Amino acid sequence: MSESSLQNEVAKRRTFAIISHPDAGKTTITEKVLLHGQQIQKAGTIKGKKSGQHAKSDWMQMEQERGISVTTSVMQFPYHNALVNLLDTPGHEDFSEDTYRTLTAVDSCLMVIDGAKGVEDRTIKLMEVTRLRDTPIITFMNKLDRDIRDPLELLDEVEDVLKIMCAPITWPIGSGKNFKGVYHLLKDETILYKTGQGHRIQEETIIKGLDNPELDEKLGVWADELREQIELVNGASNPFDKELFLAGELTPVFFGTALGNFGVDHMLDGLVDWAPKPQGRETDQQEGVSATSEDFSGFIFKIQANMDPRHRDRVAFMRIVSGKYEKGMKMRQVRTGKDVRISDALTFLAGDRSHVEEAYPGDIIGLHNHGTIQIGDTFTAGEDFKFSGIPNFAPELFRRIRLKDPLKQKQLLKGLVQLSEEGAVQVFRPLISNDLIVGAVGVLQFDVVVHRLRTEYKVDAMYENINVATARWVSSKDEKKLDEFRRRAEANLALDGGDNLTYIAPTMVNLSLAEERYPDIEFTHTREH
């Protein structure tokens, strides 16, 4: 393949994920983004569970029962001259580590905020993860078709709580029943809102300039209000600066309503124009890998079981970092040193699979996995390096897991280790007992695990509460000190699914004391795969 055609393929791609608090409208915005990409002719409405019209991006059986997106699915669609990869992230009350890890596989993020509620705690957590790589953030203030908080107050809150500068690109005219549309600060034009157009792309009425008499004609008293507001906004807010945006220090802000399908295209225009094309990545060698390098490489950031209820298969999601994937090509799995031929990679539109003939940097492909691929695995054209920056995150919730039938201990352990390799949950085996402790980032992961143990491994398990506040991976440069620590702190130590030594703390105070008592031991809350 010529270098210039590889560069062209890279230049037109944008790979991003959506971060939000549950119910801020992420699934609806995903629908509308796909509608603009012409993937779904009529956006699948996210309504009551009984309507039978399930959102296009919510799939496994459990999600369809509950109306939540538990798994990270991948959607690719064309928009203007770009090819956009959208990684959907589990967004409900609780998502899992998958959500965190997905953020390490994208080049930019769209942050969706409920205009009535402002910045919520899940959003704060997810923003912390994007900070690990200074990922550029675009913001969409949603639900303008309802009454929202004062827009300037919302911007202040984002700046204050998330420590990122805001540059408004569009500005709302009214909200709720009085929502009239938005003014585009960079284009100097007003775009009017029509209700009842949520399921299709609307013909927009655009009025150029703030002094245009047509504005008074169409908006009445709101026209003068808008002029005053824009004067205030121009004086009080940051102008858009692409370099600051790319450095993760400033976020362009768009206002709209995903449900009413208004403003989503303004945001997509910004994403395609400003968000970075696929970026290279750091490795464990001196040299990183550039996206335009001709040699193929990629890494696994997620493994999903049972996308196909008829087959007990698992699919490993790979982000391509460099080179070109071609059907039937050989690639090296660096961890095992084996060369594998991949002839049946997949692309997805949430649950609809299609086989890929070729794919490029920034694309996500699915590899069939019969238990041989793990999260964090690097695949190359033959070189031996490993991509860094695909972390495990310390769980925040813990349960002891018990069997209803004690004879199935072996199947339980097998199931839990496989589920932990997929990132569905983390498993800890205390050094001094036969307990099995399961750790998760969100409560829902526990339900998912019991459900999957029952349906995929025929194991009936239940949980008991356990007195664990947090876990930290432990290591030391001094082997003797580590051995001594292992002897003295044995009651609090466990091995995780990958046999890494872990400190299980009953309270945060206990953890602080342990860190003070053992200064030569490093306690970390993320661990590289």
Swiss-Prot record:
Per UniProt, subcellular location reads as: Cytoplasm
Q: Which PROSITE patterns does the record associate with it?
A: G_TR_1, G_TR_2
Q: What does the entry list as the binding residues for GTP?
A: 20-27, 88-92, 142-145
Domain tr-type G: where?
11-279
Q: What is its main location?
A: cytoplasm
Which protein family is named in the record?
A: Belongs to the TRAFAC class translation factor GTPase superfamily. Classic translation factor GTPase family. PrfC subfamily.
Q: Which UniProt keywords apply?
A: Cytoplasm, GTP-binding, Nucleotide-binding, Protein biosynthesis
Gene Ontology cellular-component terms listed = cytosol
Q: Which GO terms describe its molecular function?
A: GTP binding; GTPase activity; guanosine tetraphosphate binding; translation release factor activity, codon nonspecific; translation release factor activity, codon specific
Q: What is the lineage of its organism?
A: Bacteria, Pseudomonadati, Pseudomonadota, Gammaproteobacteria, Alteromonadales
One example of a Gene Ontology biological process annotation: regulation of translational termination
Which organism's genome codes for this protein? Idiomarina loihiensis (strain ATCC BAA-735 / DSM 15497 / L2-TR)
Q: Protein name, please?
A: Peptide chain release factor 3
Spell out the InterPro entries in the cross-references. Answer: EF-G-like_DII (IPR053905), EFG_III/V (IPR035647), G_TR_CS (IPR031157), P-loop_NTPase (IPR027417), PrfC (IPR004548), RF3_C (IPR032090), RF3_dom_3_sf (IPR038467), RF3_GTP-bd (IPR041732)
Which Pfam families does the annotation name?
Answer: EF-G_D2, GTP_EFTU, RF3_C
Q: What does this protein do?
A: Increases the formation of ribosomal termination complexes and stimulates activities of RF-1 and RF-2. It binds guanine nucleotides and has strong preference for UGA stop codons. It may interact directly with the ribosome. The stimulation of RF-1 and RF-2 is significantly reduced by GTP and GDP, but not by GMP.
Q: Its domain of life?
A: Bacteria
